[in-house]
Swiss-Prot record:
NDH is composed of at least 16 different subunits, 5 of which are encoded in the nucleus. This is NAD(P)H-quinone oxidoreductase subunit 6, chloroplastic. NDH shuttles electrons from NAD(P)H:plastoquinone, via FMN and iron-sulfur (Fe-S) centers, to quinones in the photosynthetic chain and possibly in a chloroplast respiratory chain. The immediate electron acceptor for the enzyme in this species is believed to be plastoquinone. Couples the redox reaction to proton translocation, and thus conserves the redox energy in a proton gradient. PANTHER family: NAD(P)H-QUINONE OXIDOREDUCTASE SUBUNIT 6, CHLOROPLASTIC (PTHR48479:SF1). The keyword DNA repair does not apply. It is a multi-pass membrane protein. Its EC number is 7.1.1.-.
Length: 199
C-alpha cells in the first residue's frame, strides 16, 4: 500500500509535519550563527522535501533529492569544520541591522504569496501522474539511462565507493594544508623564543 492510499486524516497530518520541518529548518539556517548548525539544518530541509516527493509516489526523485543535495551539504559541513579555526560561540539571534530588516521584508512578501497560492489551489482536483510499467520495460537507448540503471542495480558498491573517494579527497587536502600551517606556526614560535633568549 502506498502512502497515497492512506486515509485523508493521516495524509494531512504527515503533510503538516513535513511542512513544519521545512519551515523550522529554514528558519534555523538563517537564525543560527554557528555555521555547523546551519549546515546541518540546511541538510534537514532537502530531507523533508524528499518526504513530499514520497507522498506523491515519486520515489526516484526523492532518492535523487537526498543523494545530491544532502551529499553536497555534507561536503559543506566538512569544509566548515576544517576551515574555521576560531571558536564558535552559540548565539541564537544576532544583532539586527537595517539590511536584515530589508531582507526580511523582501522575503516575507513572496513567502506570503506562496502560502496564499498553496491555500487557494484545489489540490484535490489535481490528478497524480503514475508511471506505467511500460516505461520501465522499454529498452534503454540513452547513455545516461544505461549508466544510471547499471550504476544503481548491477554495481551499487563501486558507485558508493566513488562518492566516498570524492568526499575523502577534499578532506585529506584540507587536513594536509592545516598541518602545514600548524608546522609553520610552531617554527615561527620557536624563532621568536630564540630571539627573546639570544644566550
Amino acid at each position: 500500500m502506498s502512502v497515497i492510499d492512506l486515509p485523508e486524516f493521516f495524509y494531512k497530518a504527515i503533510l503538516l509535519l513535513i511542512e513544519s520541518g521545512v519551515i523550522l529548518g529554514s528558519l534555523g539556517v538563517v537564525l543560527f550563527t554557528n555555521i555547523v548548525y546551519s549546515a546541518f539544518l540546511l541538510g534537514w530541509v532537502p530531507v523533508c522535501i524528499s518526504f513530499l516527493y514520497i507522498l506523491l509516489n515519486a520515489d526516484f526523485v526523492a532518492a535523487v533529492q537526498i543523494l545530491i543535495y544532502v551529499g553536497t551539504i555534507n561536503v559543506l559541513i566538512v569544509f566548515a569544520v576544517m576551515l574555521i579555526n576560531k571558536p564558535q560561540y552559540f548565539r541564537f539571534l544576532k544583532y539586527w541591522t537595517v539590511g536584515d530588516g530589508t531582507a526580511l521584508a523582501l522575503c516575507t512578501s513572496p513567502f506570503l504569496s506562496i502560502i496564499a497560492a498553496i491555500l487557494s489551489t484545489p489540490w484535490s482536483k489535481i490528478s497524480l501522474i503514475v508511471l506505467s510499467n511500460k516505461i520501465v520495460e522499454e529498452p534503454l537507448t540513452d547513455n545516461v539511462q544505461r549508466i544510471g540503471f547499471h550504476s544503481l542495480t548491477d554495481s551499487p558498491l563501486p558507485f558508493e565507493l566513488l562518492s566516498i573517494i570524492l568526499l575523502v579527497a577534499p578532506v585529506g587536502a584540507i587536513t594536509m594544508a592545516r598541518r602545514e600551517e600548524a608546522v609553520e606556526a610552531e617554527e615561527s614560535e620557536a624563532l621568536k623564543t630564540k630571539d627573546d633568549f639570544p644566550f
